[in-house]
């Protein structure tokens, strides 16, 4: 058997293993946020409840053969499952082609699996699980002590400097509302693993996220204005009822803010943000939540902010939630495979100029 044939067979093997792991990651993405076991409960159709046969669970191929439908009831199966399986397979194959069977390849397999899981959960639930960020950080800390290959070798001070710079940048972004705490934890953990290569990852993630965010903002602008106006009118009517009822809401010249969220199509008010002294006269605080929930039906995930000044609602602002974890994950994965080449290319470009 020639070397080329062995290489091809090995690539096919790595691809199939990656797709099988991707199938398991689909289970992790769906069940862990719901606190369900990822082992005990067998795979089944969400529509009819029938347990899937073993020949219906071949990664990628079963979805294609079944044409994205359940064998028993014909209900549609989201193509996302196949996409995740293919994504894991391709990422594992890419890691093998870059690093071969090495320590770097082993680290890449763990890292890419974690990145796929956190991306899926972030898309579904707008949060990056703490354990995902911790896993990435553990890989980085292990790099301090384990003599891995040259691609993972970096002085300890380089990793710490990268960590410090990234932490400061992301703390600022979190404080101004540009990113969430999960994004900060992820990039801090990744900086321990990547060292100076975290900066290409950061650049790629921010650029992709910005392009996605701007595109989505332009596309959804009209719908967001309509939703904001609905919330404003409901809040005005509710607040006027409180004033007419003389329930004792007195700001005494102070400002107050009502913060609400829309999660899974269900609007709610985060009352812990309110001034308790100002609002203690209202016997039923949940009346505003009920009013918004009864009159607004939307699948949009977002947050709204109602500003009250001198007994008047002066501003209502709605902003749609945007996931950022998947874009950071793309940046981290790309930088893990090609970060050194990207940095060297950029340095060479600067020298030429």
Regions found by a protein language model. Give the residues of each.
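A membrane-topology feature that recognizes alpha-helical transmembrane segments
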Residues: 1-353
């Amino acid at each position: 058997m020639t070397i080329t044939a062995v290489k091809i067979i090995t690539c096919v093997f790595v691809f199939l293993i990656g797709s099988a792991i991707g199938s398991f990651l689909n289970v992790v993405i769906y069940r862990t946020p719901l606190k369900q076991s990822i082992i005990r409960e067998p795979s089944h159709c969400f529509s009819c409840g029938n347990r899937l046969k073993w020949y219906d669970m071949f990664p990628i191929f079963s979805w294609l053969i079944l044409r994205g439908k359940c064998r028993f009831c014909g209900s549609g199966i989201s193509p996302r499952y196949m996409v995740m399986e293919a994504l894991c397979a391709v990422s594992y194959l890419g890691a093998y082609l870059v690093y071969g069977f090495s320590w770097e390849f082993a680290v890449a397999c763990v890292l890419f699996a974690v990145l796929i899981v956190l991306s899926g959960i972030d898309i579904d639930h707008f949060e990056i699980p703490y354990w995902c960020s911790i896993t990435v950080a553990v890989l980085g800390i292990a790099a301090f002590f384990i003599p891995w290959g040259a691609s993972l070798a970096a002085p300890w001070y380089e990793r710490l400097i990268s960590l410090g710079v990234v932490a400061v940048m992301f703390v600022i972004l979190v404080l101004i509302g540009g990113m969430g705490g999960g994004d900060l934890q992820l990039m801090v953990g990744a900086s321990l693993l990547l060292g100076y290569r975290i900066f290409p990852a950061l650049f790629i993630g921010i650029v992709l996220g910005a392009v996605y965010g701007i595109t989505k903002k332009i596309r959804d602008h009209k719908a967001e204005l309509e939703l904001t106006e609905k919330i404003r009118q409901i809040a005005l009517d509710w607040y006027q009822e409180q004033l007419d009822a003389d329930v004792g809401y007195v700001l005494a010249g102070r400002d107050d803010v009502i913060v609400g969220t829309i999660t899974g199509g269900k609007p709610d008010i985060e009352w812990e943000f309110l001034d308790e002294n100002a609002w203690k006269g209202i016997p039923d605080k949940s009346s505003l939540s009920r009013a918004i929930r009864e009159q607004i039906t939307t699948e949009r995930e977002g947050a709204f902010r109602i500003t009250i000044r001198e007994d008047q609602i002066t501003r209502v602002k709605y902003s749609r939630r945007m996931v950022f974890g998947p874009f950071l994950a793309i940046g981290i994965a790309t930088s893990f495979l090609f970060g050194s080449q990207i940095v060297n290319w950029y340095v060479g470009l600067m020298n030429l100029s």
